[in-house]
């Protein structure tokens, strides 16, 4: 499941930002290309209209319709995706009000925090401290790579070599940091943690082409989303979202396939724009739900892990899922802000 999240994270900049310089984005209206499509007559449908032939579409026609550039259809697909995100935001806001105001009859984690032992509070505190540290190190790594032309050019290529190398680095760094025990080898564990954050910074580095002001806005929006959803997870019943594992796995598979499929289809086609919207907007809602799930999972793990057990509580491993959710949300919010701004021009 973690590998699928990495693919969803890695394919986003390679598919959205790099091709933006070579071909139109599905939501950025290129006036020259648009006028060319609008002014070029479709001989096939014009001929069929003149001779009055009415018959069902064949498989070839359906394929051509899916791969045909149509800015009007692409715009509608993008709008549907944005409305889907807006609906998810409304549901999240309603859940925040419902659980935050104490309207639920069940006891949430925030009520249980009063009777938590001190070691449970320390575990959760250290987990979120490492999360904040990972985000800060990732930002510093992204800035450093953006100011290194050789590394930045490599990350911006979007070739299969670049994707393969970065994906291998992400998986390798993730496996390394998870495999080292926190209590027995604190030094190597923290070095692996630094390496993992640096590698993820390289993945985020292509976002710097969007500019500092937009990324700061995206960071604030992401902080609001993460803070609001974390509050919902804390106020909701302690196992309310832990039962969403199977549906979230299905949704992750759908976003995973859409992310891979969007790499092979041009974003200016109906099929490519549909896959892009599923990976972008569906992914934003999906990883927001994952954040609810992972937050309650961290709390549950901090509560049930024995203090003197054989396997000690690992705050670094515990925060990795929330960290990946946060990065996926941030990259999609930044992309939505960028494409939304370009669409208004």
From Swiss-Prot:
Q: Topology check: give the Mitochondrial matrix ranges.
A: 46-82, 147-159, 212-213, 266-271
Q: What molecular function does GO assign, one term?
A: calcium channel activity
Q: What is its main location?
A: mitochondrion
Where, per UniProt, does this protein localize? Mitochondrion inner membrane
Topological region Mitochondrial intermembrane: 104-125, 181-190, 235-244, 293-345
Q: Where are the transmembrane segments?
A: 83-103, 126-146, 160-180, 191-211, 214-234, 245-265, 272-292
Coiled-coil intervals in this record?
Answer: none
InterPro entries, A to Z: Bax_inhibitor_1-related, GHITM
Q: What does this protein do?
A: Plays an important role in maintenance of mitochondrial morphology and in mediating either calcium or potassium/proton antiport. Mediates proton-dependent calcium efflux from mitochondrion. Also functions as an electroneutral mitochondrial proton/potassium exchanger. Required for the mitochondrial tubular network and cristae organization. Involved in apoptotic release of cytochrome c. Inhibits the proteolytic activity of AFG3L2, stimulating respiration and stabilizing respiratory enzymes in actively respiring mitochondria.
Put simply, this protein is called Growth hormone-inducible transmembrane protein
